[in-house]
Amino acid sequence: MDKRLERILPRVQKPARYVGGEYNAILKNKDEVDTRIAFCFPDTYEIGMSNLGMRILYGVMNDLPGVWCERVFAPWGDMEEELRKADMPLFALESGDPITDFHIVAFSVGYEMAFPAILNMLDLAHIPLHAADRTGLTPLVIAGGTAMYNAEPLAAFIDLVSLGEGEDVTVELIELHRRARREGWSKPDFLRAAAQLPGIYVPSLYDVTYHEDGTVASITPRDGAPAVVTKRIVHDMDKSYFPVKTIVPSTEIVQDRVTLELFRGCIRGCRFCQAGYVYRPVRNRSRDLCADYCVRSCDDTGYQEVTLSSLSTSDYPPLTDLCDELEPFCDARHVSLSLPSLRADNFSMELMQRLAKGRKTGLTFAPEAGTQRLRDVINKNVTLDDLLLSCRTAFAGGYSAVKLYFMLGLPTETDEDVLGIADVAARVMHAWRESAQNKQRGIRITVSTSWFVPKPHTAFQWEPQISKEEYERRVALLREAIKTKTVTYNWHDSDTSFMEAVLARGDRRMGKVLETAWRKGAHLDAWEEYFSLDRWLEAFDECGLDPHFYANRTRSEDELLPWSMISSGVTQAYLKRERHQAYRSVTTPDCRTHCNGCGANLLVGGTCDV
């Protein structure tokens, strides 16, 4: 261990974040590898170590002969201060080596508010921020993750972007980079070659111009770059890598358990949900393989909790059969199964009984909207009766805590829709009174609202975010309507949601705002204790840009969007059609009921009904 680090660790919170050495961490002999990759997560250890994508790609890269992938996380504020005072560069956990020793620096970016942390980590690593200032092949700075479906705010800082699922394209990119170093290519030569790999977007190979009103006028590829870059996906989940031997952290993390991915994609088509669109099409992992991964993961980690994870886990066709198959193992090993947020329209007593064998920590449902009209607008395809039936089932089975998630500011939302949230909570309370086994335990209902953030590649990508003042008015309206002590109301901070909306649909000009805000102290802005909206507003003012232009403006469907060179596989025509359906409160059936012609099946060689 570096002597400077030994002196620093006693002075920071949770020093285990920075020492590595965890069970199942991968160590290699530096003399036996030719490619070193610093796999960076622009948030803290506790968040990054919980990320399944990080676990998967860590294993994929380390399975390659001659490649050593090591982890790097954003330091907490106290650690950053100590690193800067000691002039100690940011380092990787496995070897403790500075990031400048690595050939590739790869960021996994799932949240726009992590953008400042990327700049901060580069600076802490003593790596030039701007891609144009990094003239050599190493270190190559790349990024992937769902937030990179609009990478334009980071275009000046990132050499290239990997779009979609990274298991295959990451291997191809590493091999190309090896070849480039071996044959002495220049960086421009490498980037031009990388742009020919499906799923690789090289921002520097696209020239962007703007109209006088600030909208994008043109996006012009050059040097043979494709006009549109389409995401990569895994075709066969049974042949894809799964991290059975995952790292067991040495300190508590957010998701400290086995995360078992049952399938990718989502059949539902909620119109606000970026993940639901960009992870299409649906691809299931076989039941037997899921069961095998569950058993082996518990054996290799010692975990006694397994989360059955997907965008909509209860839509996994053999879910009940999988639980049946795992029951003897779980009983013998005292392993509990848990599910994330549940669909209210397919929750059953049978499923609940299997979950009840573990810890009854409460159930979570996400109705998203307070009235059926608005649920139809967003294509939630869940009714109040569905929700109440599920709650009655849970209460009859002994559950006494329910969390309900909603959004405020959805397109077409009215005060009636807002007040409908309070009515839903009251109806759930009534369902408990009707169905609870033991009323002496009482009931805990938690209503949580977030501020709707329009995202690229969704049916609502053209919609405005409501103003901060209007959001806070609706929060106050709902708070006043929820008067019972048995219902707790939590709402999301408005300032961070506003900046998320700005960054999510930002263009390249946002890069100078991002850098200015970072220089003013925006480092860990995914955390409310570090976030300052005033800092960002000052940066916008200094750069001559208006944040409301990005967050609060309705876009014309004819407008060239900043991310128009990126395709998730879902066509723009389909997104427009879904938007028009939303304004008529017309729902679209799920993908298993009927193919709606979104285009995503073409990615796996299938057909789409138009």
Identify the function of each model-found stretch.
Residues 40, 113, 295-403, 407-446, ...:
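Conserved SAM/AdoMet-binding glycine-rich loop
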Residues 193-203, 311-316, 340-346, 409, ...:
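A glycine-rich phosphate-binding loop feature that marks nucleotide/adenosyl-phosphate handling sites
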Residues 74-221, 459-507, 515-529:
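Glycine-rich beta-alpha loop elements in corrinoid/cobalamin-binding modules
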Residues 54, 86, 122, 156-161, ...:
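Short secondary-structure boundary/capping segments
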Residues 8-38, 45-46, 203, 209-259, ...:
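N-terminal [4Fe-4S]-dependent radical SAM core
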Residues 39-43, 61, 248-274, 298, ...:
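N-terminal pre-triad scaffold of radical SAM enzymes
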Residues 1-31, 37-39, 484-610:
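Radical SAM enzyme core and accessory elements
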